[in-house]
Amino acid sequence: MSLLVQLDQKIAANGGLIVSCQPVPDSPLDKPEIVAAMALAAEQAGAVAIRIEGVANLQATRAVVSVPIIGIVKRDLEDSPVRITAYIEDVDALAQAGADIIAIDGTDRPRPVPVETLLARIHHHGLLAMTDCSTPEDGLACQKLGAEIIGTTLSGYTTPETPEEPDLALVKTLSDAGCRVIAEGRYNTPAQAADAMRHGAWAVTVGSAITRLEHICQWYNTAMKKAVL
């Protein structure tokens, strides 16, 4: 049974929650053993997959979870705005560390390695390819190039201003076009995640609202300060 079929079955049975375990950089939680513990807790709570950044974090997580892992490597490049899995060596390292799915930046922006080259390398390892996209054009282009999964991860993050709400319209557009869509980006409440499923999402990735303690505390502090000022 293929991994996609297995995921289809898990999503049908459990609702399609993917948890992104990416602590704030340099946070007290930013340690491989803590990332792995968060991932295991998410799996035990019903997550159908885990999204992990970094090879060391992925290795630690692979040792304790059985659900599929979406692996990425983030880099800040001097000559490109692309940050997510930009190099062949990143793909190779993630594959060796135990990723089941490798996600790359799928936007139409200057990059060191073409999208199609990275997709071919992912498939060379026998893994599923996910592209993190920002527009319908990005997603449809990546689907034509052979990406099995299209994420809305970068919607709102390639423009000067980032909206507060998730991009449900992009989810619906890509789903209607036949893409397997993982809704990702600003899904900070269960209601928003449910809306994404109603708009055709195959699954929904939630990160900050579950695994970034600093962000959650900031949301509460901001709301409570407004209430008393």
UniProtKB/Swiss-Prot annotation:
GO terms for molecular function: N-acylglucosamine-6-phosphate 2-epimerase activity. The keyword ATP-binding does not apply. It is an enzyme of class 5 (isomerase). Pathway: Amino-sugar metabolism; N-acetylneuraminate degradation; D-fructose 6-phosphate from N-acetylneuraminate: step 3/5. GO terms for cellular component: cytosol. SUPFAM superfamilies: Ribulose-phoshate binding barrel (SSF51366). GO terms for biological process: carbohydrate metabolic process; N-acetylmannosamine catabolic process; N-acetylneuraminate catabolic process. It catalyses: an N-acyl-D-glucosamine 6-phosphate = an N-acyl-D-mannosamine 6-phosphate. Its EC number is 5.1.3.9. Pfam families: NanE. Keywords: Carbohydrate metabolism, Isomerase. Converts N-acetylmannosamine-6-phosphate (ManNAc-6-P) to N-acetylglucosamine-6-phosphate (GlcNAc-6-P). Belongs to the NanE family. PANTHER family: N-ACETYLMANNOSAMINE-6-PHOSPHATE 2-EPIMERASE-RELATED. This is Putative N-acetylmannosamine-6-phosphate 2-epimerase. It comes from Escherichia coli O7:K1 (strain IAI39 / ExPEC).
